[in-house]
């Protein structure tokens, strides 16, 4: 599987170049802005193209070396796309609400994940000994935990890289990653704060088409990294009785085919 490809035209069609009204800008973003049109800042796509390309290579290389990528996007416009993209490539996501300490207090988060697993086992087994109210209360607990932790319950440890949509809204996630030395890829709109973002991608972080494009490209880069990891391991997949998890992810992605055109190589 080749690295995901993209063109300047795709970025333009997705509205990646549209920033916010000039009164909402962050002066720290000045180096990434091309100009102003109708009181709206225009992002310099001549910079976006190489910076997005670099970010995708970082994703691929991280995964090729066995690393984990955490997709973060909790605002309504991003939530579904973040979850779908992460699931498509076998990675992890937070799309409901960032809980304080999700990275810096991983031990406590691990305890909550363990509780979620216990509830899953309880509800999938015999609940005959429980009252209807008890089952309802446990189910509600599970739903609450699943919303917050469902995307990371299989992560098994801290991520090696964060991919963030809306660095202003996900400020806490970026601060925690910075404290732990975890690199961050972040989409930076004209009102964004670039502090703590290791690999910036200047671009609109509100338009659904733009968000979908970023997510599809990052997901494609992960899949390319998985392919590289499998190739480097020298596994004879055809001779194996059971397929590695990574291969299952690649097969599922291949089955989707043209459903994610932005991820196509």
Curated annotation (Swiss-Prot):
Pfam families: Ribosomal_S2. GO terms for cellular component: cytosolic small ribosomal subunit. Keywords: Ribonucleoprotein, Ribosomal protein. One of its GO terms (biological process) is translation. CDD domains: RPS2. One of its GO terms (molecular function) is structural constituent of ribosome. It comes from the Bacteria. Belongs to the universal ribosomal protein uS2 family. HAMAP family: Ribosomal_uS2_B. This is Small ribosomal subunit protein uS2. It comes from Gluconobacter oxydans (strain 621H) (Gluconobacter suboxydans).
């Amino acid at each position: 599987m080749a690295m995901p490809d993209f063109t300047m035209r795709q970025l333009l069609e997705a509205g990646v170049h549209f920033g916010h009204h000039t009164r909402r800008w962050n002066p720290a973003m000045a180096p990434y802005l091309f100009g102003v049109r109708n009181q709206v800042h225009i992002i310099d796509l001549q910079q976006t193209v190489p910076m997005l390309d670099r970010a995708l290579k970082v994703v691929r290389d991280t995964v090729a070396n066995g690393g984990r990528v955490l997709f973060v996007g909790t605002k309504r416009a991003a939530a579904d796309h973040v979850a779908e993209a992460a699931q498509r490539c076998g990675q992890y996501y937070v799309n409901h609400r960032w809980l304080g300490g999700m990275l810096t207090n991983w031990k406590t988060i691990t305890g909550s994940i363990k509780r979620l697993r216990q509830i899953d086992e309880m509800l999938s087994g015999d609940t005959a000994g429980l009252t209807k109210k008890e089952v309802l209360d446990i189910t509600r607990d599970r739903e609450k935990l699943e919303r917050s932790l469902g995307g990371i319950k299989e992560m098994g440890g801290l991520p090696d890289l964060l991919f963030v949509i809306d660095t202003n809204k996900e400020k806490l996630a970026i601060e925690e990653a910075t404290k732990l030395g975890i690199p961050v890829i972040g989409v930076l709109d004209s009102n964004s704060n670039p502090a703590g973002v290791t690999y910036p991608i200047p671009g609109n972080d509100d338009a659904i088409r733009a968000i979908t494009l970023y997510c599809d490209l990052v997901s494609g880069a992960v899949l390319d990294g998985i392919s590289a990891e499998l190739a480097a391991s020298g596994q004879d997949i055809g001779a194996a009785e059971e397929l590695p998890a990574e291969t299952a992810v690649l097969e599922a992605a291949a089955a989707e085919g043209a459903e994610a055109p932005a991820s196509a190589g």
